[in-house]
């Protein structure tokens, strides 16, 4: 009888044993598989490593690791020695070779086809085929682990609001030392919300952006039904209205396309565009208006070139051209600015034609979380000679009509944005959005910040002070989390020490860049079958793509061709800032923090 009791106790104890993969034992992208209840096996296939935990490098891997400089060394080289890079930029074969390496080395860090999602921490047909999920760079932490992050850290995670209050919330506006402006901030917001479209009815692991990339559904609508409501069905154009001699989006009443507006917004200010949340702030509607004008302008160009084409072909070809323009602007203007490189990035799909590369993409949940760059937002928005606080700015398209697109472009080009890394720079107006980012990451069972660093071949941080580069926030972090290997992804990205004179820390760049470049170059228009003049209506359409820039987009569609770029033109606006954030509070506590939080727009 005693023997039976002991056996029963042993079985019960075994059934409550933690999943052996909770400790994330497999290194260097090795895959952990449980064997029985208390054993695991690491699959090191094609990792370049071997051993029980995939920790021993093969001979060629050892040589590569010895020769490979650290990411910070590469960043230093690319952001210094301007004279050398000026020479390289003017030697086509050298520039092409370096750009090709940048694209392949970054893109190969992304699994394609996708591997995991929030409900499947192992390879499955469901994880591959179900487009309604965001994919995952790392599988979720197993359900039966001793702690929320696996085996490290406390048994209960710190209160998300406490994290935001102590580490993320702005005390005083910290400008971006790279000089990013509000044209950049709103471009980032407008561009990314064609593929960051969380389905909040189903949960943060699900997306409504089934195109999983640059398909411009934020211009044309996610569904065919919405697209048809927005189209004019004449000469390929989108519906529009003329106000004071300039083109603006049509109204909800004229299109019957659903948009999110509060009841108090009058009908004539309820503009209808592809993304239903873009009525939130005039900065988003500014870009929506500019791209509407660009689509209809391209239709006119194609109509002149191809009078024989009907409405459908003009529409579809114009959409492909705008996709090409978008990718070109993102790589050569937007990413170029973010990088701070003296090396000139180049959009040229032919660089990958002789490489092993898959022309498909799946948006990762971690990429969505990483892109919550709310510290970019200022305390107030300066348009011409007027300042608007958040309560005056949101859902107020009358500002757009009052000032006009030209004044918006001029003003946002001059207004500096905030620094993202370094901590304590999230505006109080979006405090609840930052808190939701932490809560949703927990719901999706993200692995720790250091596990993501290892996944992207970065050395894990060994101390809190190494992470933040200062003492005050590192002490707060340690009190909250207890273990550097238990710090969560989103808070760590925002408190990580910035690179010298940079907007981001190392991890934001080294994790974000692979997702970004794979998503851009994995677009179907970049494939050999598509990347040819005939796809875009001939040389005229191809030329529109190959000469696109943020300045040309503005000049072609905004009265007076105001100067613009993604950085402030006046160097005096860029002030030297310290790595650690100020501990004094800003004066924006009276703003209702829930004002930007609507059920379907928390990513904004």
Swiss-Prot record:
Broad class of the protein's primary localization: membrane
Documented effect of changing residue 516 to A: No effect on protein stability. Increased decrease of protein stability
Up-regulation conditions: By cytokines and mitogens. Up-regulated by IL1B. Up-regulated by lipopolysaccharide (LPS).
Superkingdom assignment: Eukaryota
Residues at the active site: 193 (proton acceptor), 371 (for cyclooxygenase activity)
Effect recorded for residue 189 to R: Impairs two-electron hydroperoxide reduction and cyclooxygenase activity
PROSITE patterns the record matches: EGF_3, PEROXIDASE_3
GO terms (BP aspect): brown fat cell differentiation; cellular response to fluid shear stress; cellular response to hypoxia; cellular response to non-ionic osmotic stress; cyclooxygenase pathway; decidualization; embryo implantation; lipoxygenase pathway
Binding annotation for substrate: 106, 341
Keywords: Acetylation, Dioxygenase, Disulfide bond, Endoplasmic reticulum, Fatty acid biosynthesis, Fatty acid metabolism, Glycoprotein, Heme, Iron, Lipid biosynthesis, Lipid metabolism, Membrane, Metal-binding, Microsome, Nucleus, Oxidoreductase, Peroxidase, Prostaglandin biosynthesis, Prostaglandin metabolism, S-nitrosylation, Signal
Pathway assigned to this chain's UniProt record: Lipid metabolism; prostaglandin biosynthesis
Any further remark recorded for this protein: The conversion of arachidonate to prostaglandin H2 is a 2 step reaction: a cyclooxygenase (COX) reaction which converts arachidonate to prostaglandin G2 (PGG2) and a peroxidase reaction in which PGG2 is reduced to prostaglandin H2 (PGH2). The cyclooxygenase reaction occurs in a hydrophobic channel in the core of the enzyme. The peroxidase reaction occurs at a heme-containing active site located near the protein surface. The nonsteroidal anti-inflammatory drugs (NSAIDs) binding site corresponds to the cyclooxygenase active site.
Protein's name in the database: Prostaglandin G/H synthase 2
């Amino acid at each position: 009888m005693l023997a039976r009791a002991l056996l029963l106790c042993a079985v019960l104890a075994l059934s409550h044993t933690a999943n052996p993969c909770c400790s994330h034992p497999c290194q260097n992208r090795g895959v952990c598989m449980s064997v029985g209840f208390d054993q695991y096996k690491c699959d090191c296939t094609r990792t370049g490593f071997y051993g029980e935990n995939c920790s021993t490098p093969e001979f060629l891997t050892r040589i590569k690791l010895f020769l490979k400089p650290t990411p910070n060394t590469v960043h230093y080289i690319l952001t210094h020695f301007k004279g050398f890079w000026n020479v390289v930029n003017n030697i086509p074969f050298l520039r092409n070779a370096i750009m090709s390496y940048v694209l392949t080395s970054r893109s190969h860090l992304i699994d394609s086809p996708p591997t995991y999602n929030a409900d499947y921490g192992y390879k499955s047909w469901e994880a591959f085929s179900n487009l309604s999920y965001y994919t995952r760079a790392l599988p979720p932490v197993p359900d039966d682990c001793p702690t929320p992050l696996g085996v490290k850290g406390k048994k209960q995670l710190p209160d998300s609001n406490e994290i935001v209050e102590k580490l993320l919330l702005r005390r005083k506006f910290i400008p971006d030392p790279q000089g990013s402006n509000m044209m950049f901030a709103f471009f980032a917001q407008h561009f990314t919300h064609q593929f960051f479209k969380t389905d909040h009815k189903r949960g943060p692991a699900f997306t409504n952006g089934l195109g999983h990339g640059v398909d411009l559904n934020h211009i044309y609508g996610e569904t065919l039904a919405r697209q048809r409501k927005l189209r004019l069905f004449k000469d390929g154009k989108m519906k529009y209205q003329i106000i004071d001699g300039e083109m603006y989006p049509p109204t909800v009443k004229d299109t019957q396309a659903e948009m999110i507006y509060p009841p108090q917004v009058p009908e004539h200010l309820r503009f209808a565009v592809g993304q239903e949340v873009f009525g939130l702030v005039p900065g988003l509607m500014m870009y929506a208006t500019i791209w509407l004008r660009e689509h209809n302008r391209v239709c006119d160009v194609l109509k002149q070139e191809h009078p024989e084409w009907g409405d459908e072909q003009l529409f579809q070809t114009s959409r492909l051209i705008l996709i090409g323009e978008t990718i070109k602007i993102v790589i050569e203007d937007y990413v170029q600015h973010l990088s701070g490189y003296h090396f000139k990035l180049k959009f040229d799909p032919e660089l990958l034609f002789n490489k092993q590369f898959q022309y498909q993409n799946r948006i990762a949940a971690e990429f969505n979380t990483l892109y919550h760059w709310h510290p970019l937002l200022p305390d107030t928005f300066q348009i011409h000679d007027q300042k608007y606080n958040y309560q005056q700015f949101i859902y107020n398209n009358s500002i757009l009509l009052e000032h006009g697109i030209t004044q918006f472009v001029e003003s946002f080009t001059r207004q500096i944005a905030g620094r993202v890394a370094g901590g304590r720079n999230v505006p109080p107006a979006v405090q609840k959005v930052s808190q939701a980012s932490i809560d949703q990451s927990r719901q999706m069972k993200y692995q720790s910040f250091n596990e993501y660093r290892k996944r992207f071949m970065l050395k894990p941080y060994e101390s809190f002070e190494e992470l933040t580069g200062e003492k005050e926030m590192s002490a707060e972090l340690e009190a909250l989390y207890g273990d550097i290997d238990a710090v969560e992804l989103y808070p760590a990205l925002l408190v990580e020490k910035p690179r010298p004179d940079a907007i981001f820390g190392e991890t934001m760049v080294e994790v974000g860049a692979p997702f970004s470049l794979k998503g851009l170059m994995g677009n179907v228009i970049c494939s050999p079958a598509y990347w040819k003049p005939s796809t875009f209506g001939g040389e005229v359409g191809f030329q529109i793509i190959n000469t696109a820039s943020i300045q040309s987009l503005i000049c072609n569609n905004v009265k007076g061709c105001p100067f613009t770029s993604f950085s402030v033109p006046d160097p005096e606006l860029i002030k030297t800032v310290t790595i650690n954030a100020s501990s004094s509070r800003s004066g924006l506590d009276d703003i209702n923090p829930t004002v930007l939080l609507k059920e379907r727009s928390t990513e904004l």
